[in-house]
Amino acid sequence: MPAAPLAEAPFSPNPGNLRMFRYLPKGLKAGAPLVVVLHGCGQTASGYDTGAGWCELAAELGFAVLAPEQKAANNPNTCFDWFNPEDITRGQGECASIAAMIRAVVDTHRLDARRVFITGLSAGGAMTAAMLATYPELFAGGAIIAGLPFGAAANVRDALETMRSAPLKAPQQWGDAVRAAAGYAGPWPKISIWHGALDTTVNVNNAQASVAQWADVHGLALGAAKQEMADGAIRLSWGDQLEVYTIPVLSHGTPIDSRDVGRPAPFILDVGISSSRRIARFWGLAPLAASRSAPRPAPVRAATPQEPALPEIEAVLAPRLTPHPGAETLIRRALKAVGLLKR
């Protein structure tokens, strides 16, 4: 049964001038978890939720959904401003607005403040990383889909270059950016990272940088990862603290399995693996979906999304290969091991 639609609700303070939508399944009990869902560029809160299926999962599993929405007045492409220092600094801008929404929903509906999770796609994935860095005490877990590491950009020019290839930094440098954002010493949220190998909008080495960042924050050795195949994706995991899915047939978007929850749409790509359900499982909200006998759909490739558009700047930014030692090596080794990358 389709979930009820997201409903807009007031909140304050709102220094980032965002809108707040939330969904509370019928009969939701006090002490339920909360999942915060951040849309990508050119999307709306409800449109992204329909595609990714979070409200469907909420109705099934018994958690609340909070879906912030960007305004065109802030960003003409309705991207969250993950590259603007005024919006990704603790106590300021869009991050402060999202934190205020979380506190309002948790307090008003008596949700479990110890089980708040956040996920997002593309610009929403980058803003997810920003929230996890600037307000880590609010979250038990996060999931970054086709996103970027925190601290990768401080202006539009940086953002465009980073989307092409993440800056080359040592894992400790990436980790230091997170540790400095809130002056927080832990415990840290568990992190799930998802990226398509065919993504030409946000280079997959941003996933490698995100792995390096959060492995360093958690004090994990990159070489200690467990490797497995999962519905055509390559999964590397470090216990219950960190995981990364690399999907060979995925371009830029959120991967879904339409036989489960969600619906295909622009940048919601039906490639036979439900990221939403697997993320919920990693967070401890759901068991893994039962296997299905239906044939896997053909891979869907998406057009270039509406990212911050500055053609005159983009034209002069040459692509740069900036590998991330350790994280990149692990992912490339995994691809080779299953025959998806030539030796």
For each of these PLM feature ranges, what is it?
Residues 193-195, 199:
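Short beta-strand/loop motif that positions the catalytic acidic residue
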Residues 39, 120-122, 196:
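Conserved alpha/beta-hydrolase "nucleophile elbow" surrounding the catalytic nucleophile
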Residues 69-93:
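Cap/lid segment of the alpha/beta-hydrolase catalytic domain
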Residues 37-40, 67:
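Structural cue for short, hydrophobic secondary-structure segments
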Residues 86-109, 130:
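Alpha/beta-hydrolase active-site loop
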Residues 40-44, 250:
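Active-site glycine-rich loops that stabilize anionic/oxyanionic intermediates
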Residues 106-108, 113-184, 200:
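Primarily recognizes the serine-hydrolase "nucleophile elbow" in alpha/beta-hydrolase
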Residues 1-34, 46-53, 60, 64, ...:
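A domain-start/cap signature at the N-terminus of enzymes
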